[in-house]
Amino acid sequence: MENNKKILESSKKLSSYGDGESRFSFLEKILAPLFLALTAIYFVMLIFPIISMIRYSGGSHIIQTLYDQDNIKTIILSFVTSLIALIFTFIIGTPTAFCINFVRNKVLSKILDIFVEIPVVLPPAVAGIALLLAFGKNGVVGNFLSNHGINVIFTSTAVIIAQFFVSSALYVRVLRDSVKSVPIELFEVSYVLGAGKIETIIKIMIPMLKKSIVSGLILAWIRSLGEFGATLMFAGNIIGKTRTIPLQIYTYMQDDIKMATAFATILYIMTFVLLLLVRLSIRDDD
């Protein structure tokens, strides 16, 4: 209702501009080409560096990259750790997104939203330091684990934790926004029919929002695959153990830029394909 009122008010304002039609027509002739030019500049700035990278890497180097044993280990490690992080993201992030929406206290709800947003905007190095201090031997969690003979830092587990920390928020945000768009009447009808909140979520909401769930998970997976700073600070750069694709690119940049760009091209292609799946999923949902 509020959106409809805003649309009507905007329409009235536009209709009141009839006297200045010639003035706005003149401005449109100037601004329309300017907008197109700025849009073209924006996409050139986005696309040209990527084209340059692909041209520089060359097809032979990309193929050579895929035959290197260390690179194969890196790719396998990246996929395994990111998929495990994705499973935890779904298991933990799904109820979290619903619980945030069910919080009645607006202040508490906003505070929880801020905590969800922080990993998205936090510099990766800061996230790495925070995880290092929390899970280190002197940290609260790390000290407890150390007393039980469990070491997390500089292990594959640390990679999974870092990937989960930086990527899960994307999934929670997508699902939270989708839940907010569901009419409140749907919940009320479900309650009247005798279903509880959990039953409503499992039997009605999750099947209804499956496209949003898939899209959010793919976005989180992309973020996990591209995670660099927090992983480097928290898990290190150990081949076959903690060296993911971004860390392998970082390592190659020190002495073999051709291989670095070839690996970067592979990561770009993977990201593009996954984002394309997200777009197709959203289009099908619409």
UniProtKB/Swiss-Prot annotation:
GO terms for cellular component: plasma membrane. It is a multi-pass membrane protein. It comes from Clostridium pasteurianum. It is found in: Cell membrane. Gene3D superfamilies: MetI-like. May be involved in molybdenum transport. GO terms for molecular function: molybdate ion transmembrane transporter activity. Belongs to the binding-protein-dependent transport system permease family. CysTW subfamily. Its main location: membrane. The chain crosses the membrane at residues 34-54, 75-95, 114-134, 152-172, 216-236, 257-277. CDD domains: TM_PBP2. One of its GO terms (biological process) is nitrogen fixation. Residues 75-278 form the ABC transmembrane type-1 domain. Keywords: Cell membrane, Membrane, Molybdenum, Nitrogen fixation, Transmembrane, Transmembrane helix, Transport. InterPro entries: MetI-like (IPR000515), MetI-like_sf (IPR035906), ModB_ABC (IPR011867), NifC_ABC_porter (IPR006469). This is Probable transport system permease protein NifC.
